[in-house]
């Protein structure tokens, strides 16, 4: 009995010693990790490196960032200020908030900083993508891609975008059950990208299969760049390979079959624009270009669409004010959008609708910020930003802390109205699409899509929350509901009366 007690005490002592050793090892390794990055400061600059934590060896604070969401940024900003250091996705990083700080970074492209996304993002988007190009190559690619988003191009996409949205809302309204808005918004924006932007003629089954692969790709675009079995990065690479194979097949079929087309889609324009600028695009460039177009049109637009629906649910007075504007501009008549009423210029003239979309993008900016690599050491907010480090300028936090916006946490479209124009008080206080020479090329298409969605929601649907409370919002990798946003949609006829489903009609007939 005594020996058994001794064995138990010995085992507990050994376990305690092991735990203490592990804790000491972690503490020492973490301290060495901090010193390793402190040693990278530019010795020729007297300013200190920004305050902050580099987390644990190799992984840094990546898991804190993923698990804490918006609290990660806000807690560190409160502790360290608008400029602080961290270590995310395998790279030392300085996060930057505030209009003046962001302005210096965006205006310093090519001489202070250069675009460089995390390694996983660079590898998965591909070497030929616009996002990964720099210097003269970037300028050339931007000219080629810019025609995709010209006024003429948007006008040609508009009827197709409207049709895709109308068909989707009819499906939502015909479903007697509630729908998961974020999931369905992802399917909607993916369908828009594939069928409208790229003009691919895929069956519903092929579209569904491609969507599943694409989701796996998107989920791992921002992952630790560790290429080992079962890692997110490896899953992303596998999804990219499958996508490129499917895209090559779709592109070849499209190039061979040009019959029955009534408009030039983005892929047509991209091919012709490449020829006009003296360089016919290779198949690899076309595949990378189409993948990037889908990626750009998908996640951020689905995020903003979900935020739009949620805010219209929360603020029915905003929805009614939208309807009044549509009626006043002869777009909405007897509860329906007048045929042929939607033109790009007409939509652009709807001032209140524009305010609503601007406020959605201010309060729920889908993208947290943009990545840059430091080309030469410079000063920011009293700190040195060392050469070779990465910088992430924060869009969302700059919006949240901008002094020009009153009641910053309140959804208030009127702040962008002609009487207030809060966004006019500072160029870099409001930047949902970035800024400088690398501002988002597709911003006008994204806003057009959101406006058409708002118009169609106002005209053909009544919708209500199917749960007792609204879900919490998560900001990583894009703004989205942490739990499902469940909503029931009801179709409306020309008199704004609900259209009953077949089952409801039968039940009504038996009463």
Curated annotation (Swiss-Prot):
GO terms for biological process: retinoic acid catabolic process. It is an enzyme of class 1 (oxidoreductase). It is found in: Endoplasmic reticulum membrane; Microsome membrane. Pfam families: p450. Its EC number is 1.14.13.-. InterPro entries: Cyt_P450, Cyt_P450_CS, Cyt_P450_E_grp-IV, Cyt_P450_sf. Heme binds at residue 440. Keywords: Endoplasmic reticulum, Heme, Iron, Lipid metabolism, Membrane, Metal-binding, Microsome, Monooxygenase, Oxidoreductase. Its cofactor is heme. GO terms for cellular component: endoplasmic reticulum membrane. GO terms for molecular function: all-trans retinoic acid 18-hydroxylase activity; heme binding; iron ion binding; retinoic acid 4-hydroxylase activity. It comes from the Eukaryota. It is a peripheral membrane protein. It catalyses: all-trans-retinoate + reduced [NADPH--hemoprotein reductase] + O2 = all-trans-4-hydroxyretinoate + oxidized [NADPH--hemoprotein reductase] + H2O + H(+); all-trans-retinoate + reduced [NADPH--hemoprotein reductase] + O2 = all-trans-18-hydroxyretinoate + oxidized [NADPH--hemoprotein reductase] + H2O + H(+). SUPFAM superfamilies: Cytochrome P450. A cytochrome P450 monooxygenase involved in the metabolism of retinoates (RAs), the active metabolites of vitamin A, and critical signaling molecules in animals. RAs exist as at least four different isomers: all-trans-RA (atRA), 9-cis-RA, 13-cis-RA, and 9,13-dicis-RA, where atRA is considered to be the biologically active isomer, although 9-cis-RA and 13-cis-RA also have activity. Belongs to the cytochrome P450 family. PANTHER family: CYTOCHROME P450 26, CYTOCHROME P450 26B1. This is Cytochrome P450 26B1. It comes from Xenopus tropicalis (Western clawed frog).
């Amino acid at each position: 009995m005594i020996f058994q007690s001794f064995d138990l005490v010995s085992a507990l002592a050994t376990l305690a010693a092991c735990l203490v050793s592990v804790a000491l090892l972690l503490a020492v390794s973490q301290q060495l990790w901090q010193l390793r990055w402190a040693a990278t400061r530019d010795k020729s600059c007297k300013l200190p490196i920004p305050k902050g934590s580099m987390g644990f060896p190799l992984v840094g604070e990546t898991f804190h960032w993923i698990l804490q969401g918006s609290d990660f940024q806000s807690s560190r900003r409160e502790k360290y200020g608008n400029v602080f250091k961290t270590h995310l996705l395998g790279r030392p990083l300085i996060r930057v908030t505030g209009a003046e700080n962001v302005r210096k970074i965006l205006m310093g492209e090519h001489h202070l900083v250069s675009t460089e996304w995390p390694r996983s993002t660079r590898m998965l988007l591909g070497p030929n993508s616009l996002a990964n190009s720099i210097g003269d190559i970037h300028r050339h690619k931007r000219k080629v891609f810019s025609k995709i988003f010209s006024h003429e191009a948007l006008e040609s996409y508009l009827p197709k975008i409207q049709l895709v949205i109308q068909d989707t809302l009819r499906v939502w309204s015909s479903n007697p059950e509630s729908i998961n808005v974020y999931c369905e918004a992802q399917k909607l924006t993916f369908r828009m990208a594939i069928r409208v932007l790229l003009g691919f003629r895929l069956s519903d089954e092929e579209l569904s299969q491609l969507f599943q692969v694409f989701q796996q790709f998107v989920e791992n675009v921002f992952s630790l760049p560790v290429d080992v079995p079962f890692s997110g990065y490896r899953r992303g690479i596998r999804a990219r390979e499958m996508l490129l194979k499917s895209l090559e097949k779709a592109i070849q079929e499209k190039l061979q079959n040009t019959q029955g087309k009534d408009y030039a889609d983005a892929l047509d324009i991209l091919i012709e624009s490449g020829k006009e600028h003296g360089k016919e695009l290779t198949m690899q460039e076309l595949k990378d270009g189409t993948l990037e177009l889908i990626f750009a049109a998908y996640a951020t637009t689905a995020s903003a669409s979900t935020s739009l629906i949620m805010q219209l649910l929360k603020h029915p007075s905003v929805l009614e004010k939208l309807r009044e504007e549509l009626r006043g501009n002869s777009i909405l008549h007897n509860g329906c959008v007048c045929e042929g009423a939607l033109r790009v210029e007409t939509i652009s003239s709807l001032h209140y609708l524009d305010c609503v979309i601007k406020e959605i993008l201010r309060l729920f900016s889908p993208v947290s910020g943009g990545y840059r690599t430091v080309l030469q050491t410079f000063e920011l907010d009293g700190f040195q930003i060392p050469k070779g480090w990465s910088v992430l300028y924060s869009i969302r936090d700059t919006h949240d802390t901008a002094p020009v916006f009153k009641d910053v946490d309140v959804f208030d479209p009127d702040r962008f109205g002609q009487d207030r124009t809060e966004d006019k008080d500072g160029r870099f206080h409001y930047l949902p699409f970035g800024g400088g020479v690398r501002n988002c090329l597709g911003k006008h298409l994204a806003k057009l899509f959101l406006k058409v969605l708002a118009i169609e929601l106002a005209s053909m649907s009544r919708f209500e929350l199917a749960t007792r409370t609204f879900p919490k919002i998560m900001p990583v990798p894009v703004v989205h509901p942490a739990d499902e946003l469940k909503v029931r949609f009801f179709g409306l006829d020309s008199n704004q009366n609900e259209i009953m489903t077949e089952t409801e009609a039968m039940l009504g007939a038996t009463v």
